[in-house]
Amino acid sequence: MLDIRPIPAFADNYIWMIVLPDGGAVVVDPGDAMPVINTLQRLNLQLTAVLLTHHHRDHNGGINQLRDWAKSNGQSFTVYGAVTSDYSDVLCRDGDTVDISGLTSPVRVLSVPGHTLDHLAFVVDNALFCGDTLFSGGCGRLFEGDAGQLYDSLAKLASLPDDTLVYCAHEYTLSNLRFALAVEPQNQCLQDYVKQVNNLREANKPSLPSTLGTEKAINPFLRVDTATVHAAVAAQAGQKVPDEVTCLALLRRWKDNF
């Protein structure tokens, strides 16, 4: 089982670190270098690789400082990211598999456009690092892509096994769940999950990881195929909802203004 640690950054980011048995570490989306450096030093680890999900600065802003720090210690690491990223040493495309020293299984690359056009997700064993595409109880805003792209991306992620652990990049869960309750107030699984997350946050613990099985039961953006979400969206928008992509687009607009 992977040893995955959250490194809090900024107001609500998580930089995820996979601690490797050989003393290495793989870091996902290091938007800030110092929390990563402090963790590496505290655990006496060497940074082996960086996985980049997309180009927003709160995800890649620490890479140059990390490179300078590694070089000053006689070390180096490899950055795996989109073909559009200036930081990428290895250019990753949908369907690629990447072998990283210290990981017992290859990293699978998924293209998941919507939040950004070049957004990637990485699957390592049963762990999904999905950046800002899928959140617990929500999904990322459409900054570059459209609802059709986001729908396909969420469907791709939802096709993974239900026990897949969801490591998204922000602690947005409680805010997302308030919206989810507005959409499906009678969803018992959602009500139970809200209590669970409240307990975790009151104990100052991350709400993550979630699981895909949980998200399919509580996340309205993965439930646009259900009658309850369709009805709620139609009532809120005051219009017919002819298909799931339209439902997702209207749901995202509702959330943007919630």
From Swiss-Prot:
Q: Where does Zn(2+) 2 bind?
A: 58-59, 132, 170
Class of enzymatic activity (EC top level): hydrolase
According to its UniProt record, the EC number is 3.1.2.6
Q: How is the cofactor bound?
A: Binds 2 Zn(2+) ions per subunit.
Positions binding Zn(2+) 1 in this chain are 54, 56, 115, 132
Query: Its catalytic activity?
Result: an S-(2-hydroxyacyl)glutathione + H2O = a 2-hydroxy carboxylate + glutathione + H(+)
Q: Can you name this protein?
A: Hydroxyacylglutathione hydrolase
The organism of origin for this protein: Shewanella amazonensis (strain ATCC BAA-1098 / SB2B)
